[in-house]
Amino acid sequence: MSVEQRVKEIIADQLGVEMEKITPEARFVDDLGADSLDVVELIMAFEEEFGVEIPDEDAEKIATVKDVLDYIKSKQG
């Protein structure tokens, strides 16, 4: 399974949104209805799933699905 597909599944599970709504440009808060706690839980789920650590200063910059995909791919090398 691709990183993108797994990220989308995590978002769908955590936020209860339909997969079709999870586009690279979708913003977690504005488009997918996440609140600040949801975002923290998403970051933790991404860290666990992909074996990366996302420091708070980096997490604050992650606002869209594309942001998290780019971040994970950059850390996986």
Curated annotation (Swiss-Prot):
Localization terms from the record: Cytoplasm
Modified residues (O-(pantetheine 4'-phosphoryl)serine): S36
Pathway of action: Lipid metabolism; fatty acid biosynthesis
Gene Ontology terms: biological process: lipid A biosynthetic process
InterPro entries: ACP (IPR003231), ACP-like_sf (IPR036736), PKS_PP-bd (IPR020806), PP-bd_ACP (IPR009081), Ppantetheine_attach_site (IPR006162)
Any one Gene Ontology molecular-function term assigned to this protein's record: acyl carrier activity
Domain Carrier: 1-76
One GO cellular component, as annotated: cytosol
Domain of life: Bacteria
First-listed, main subcellular location of the protein, grouped into a coarse class: cytoplasm
Modifications after synthesis and translation: 4'-phosphopantetheine is transferred from CoA to a specific serine of apo-ACP by AcpS. This modification is essential for activity because fatty acids are bound in thioester linkage to the sulfhydryl of the prosthetic group.
Disulphides: none
Keyword entries, A-Z: Cytoplasm, Fatty acid biosynthesis, Fatty acid metabolism, Lipid biosynthesis, Lipid metabolism, Phosphopantetheine, Phosphoprotein
Function: Carrier of the growing fatty acid chain in fatty acid biosynthesis.
Family, as annotated: Belongs to the acyl carrier protein (ACP) family.
UniProt cross-references to PANTHER family, sorted A to Z: ACYL CARRIER PROTEIN, CARRIER DOMAIN-CONTAINING PROTEIN
Protein name (database record): Acyl carrier protein
Species: Sulfurihydrogenibium sp. (strain YO3AOP1)
